[in-house]
Regions:
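Lipid interaction determinants
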Residues: 18-229, 240-258
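Positively charged n-region of N-terminal signal peptides that target proteins for export
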Residues: 1-4
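Sec-dependent N-terminal signal peptides
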Residues: 6-11
Length: 258
């Protein structure tokens, strides 16, 4: 009898030891970790940050900054510093971002004169984007959001738009393209009777003097992002050329962005 009881106890212990271990909320914990990993993958330099809302410490909209939502006003971050564009002048300065805190160094600015509304926009955003701010990155990589809380309690909310480097998956090469005054008929594989920009690369020496052309005019079978061609006007553009890592089937493998 004792042997039977002992054998049953051993079997029960073995079955318990071999059973899979689980804990309440195991599935939700995994989902939380996945979401957290997605958020931690977000980075300030990977996006242009467009102003979407601006409120003061009491939650009221800041009138002078509403112009920056319509314009829109945009932040960008790089190894060289932070840039603010969309007002009258470009403002720029150093920054550090760590553990949910954004520290902005004293901003410098270009010195254009504009209508009062844009000048006020520059002053208001510069007044808030200084010193230590509380920064919160949220959302997924496809729809990121940035919230900045200034020292006066103002809350600035931004939505992220991928930079070309993020969108195309390459660093990009800076080059100069000369664009001919007239478009020319070209054989586009997707668009009948298409007219291409005629371009050629231009180079400069260390003194900034333009060198003689090293190639003939040739058709560009795509647009240049950020460039609107004026018929009859020849121009030289400073562009970045990106290798598109995973382009759609009907898209070019290289992209030109001003």
């Amino acid at each position: 009898m004792k042997k039977t009881i002992l054998l049953a106890s051993v079997c029960a212990a073995l079955l318990q030891a071999c059973a899979p271990v689980s804990s309440p909320g195991e599935g939700s914990s995994t989902m939380s970790t996945t979401a957290s990993s997605s958020r931690s993958a977000l980075s300030l330099p990977a996006y242009y940050w467009r102003l979407a809302a601006a409120t003061d410490a009491s939650g009221k909209a800041i009138p002078a900054l509403q112009r920056g939502i319509e314009q829109p006003l945009r932040l960008s971050f790089s190894a060289d510093g932070m840039n603010i564009r969309g007002g009258c002048n470009t403002q720029f300065g150093g920054y550090t971002y760590k553990d949910g805190g954004l520290r902005v160094a004293t901003l410098a600015s270009t010195m254009k004169a504009c209508e009062p509304g844009l000048m006020k926009l520059d002053a208001e955003i510069g007044q808030r984007l200084k010193g230590d701010l509380r920064a919160t990155l949220s959302g997924e990589s496809t729809e990121p959001a940035l919230e900045l809380v200034a020292q006066d309690g103002s809350v600035l909310k931004f939505v992220g738009e991928p930079t070309p480097e993020t969108l195309y998956g390459s660093a990009g090469e800076t080059m100069f393209l000369e664009v001919a005054p007239k478009r020319a008929d070209c054989s586009h594989p997707m668009i009948p009777r298409y007219q291409c920009l005629m371009v050629r690369e231009r180079r400069y020496n260390d003194a900034g003097v333009q060198l003689p052309p090293q190639e003939d005019w040739h058709p560009l079978y795509q647009s240049i992002e950020g460039y609107d061609h004026r018929d009859g006007v020849r121009t030289v553009l400073r562009v970045k050329r990106y290798d598109w890592k995973n382009p759609p089937a009907d898209a070019p493998s290289k992209v030109y962005v001003m």
